[in-house]
From Swiss-Prot:
Family matches, as HAMAP family: Ribosomal_bS20
UniProt-recorded name of the protein: Small ribosomal subunit protein bS20
GO cellular component, one term: cytosol
The organism's taxonomic lineage, starting at the top: Bacteria, Pseudomonadati, Pseudomonadota, Gammaproteobacteria, Alteromonadales
Keywords associated with the record: Ribonucleoprotein, Ribosomal protein, RNA-binding, rRNA-binding
Residue ranges, annotated region (Disordered): 1-31
GO biological process, one term: translation
Record field: transmembrane: none
Species for this entry: Pseudoalteromonas atlantica (strain T6c / ATCC BAA-1087)
Gene Ontology molecular function, alphabetical: small ribosomal subunit rRNA binding; structural constituent of ribosome
Function comment: Binds directly to 16S ribosomal RNA.
Length: 87
């Protein structure tokens, strides 16, 4: 454990950030799984609805630095292509 006051504060802040980021990461993964489940079921309408809900979440995570912007773009591109292939 840190002895210096500023180091203690940094430890508390980083733990708070870690928990917050874990929550956001979990939320993002859940939304991606919902889209993939809808694609797997073959229901294009529900897949599009889930994708529409997941897209702003993915973008927000990229903006906040939780995931890289290229990773966000890759996720959206691949999911979109899979939904298009359902037709």
């Amino acid at each position: 454990m840190a002895n210096i006051k500023s180091a203690k504060k940094r430890a508390l802040q980083s733990e708070r950030r870690r928990q917050h980021n874990a929550s956001r990461r979990s939320m993002t993964r859940t939304s991606l799984k919902k889209v993939l489940a809808a694609i797997a079921s073959g229901d294009k309408a529900s897949a599009q609805a889930a994708f529409a809900a997941a897209t702003p979440l993915i973008d927000r995570m990229a903006t906040k630095g939780l995931i890289h912007k290229n990773k966000a773009a890759r996720h959206k591109s691949r999911l979109s292509a899979q939904i298009k292939a359902l037709a």
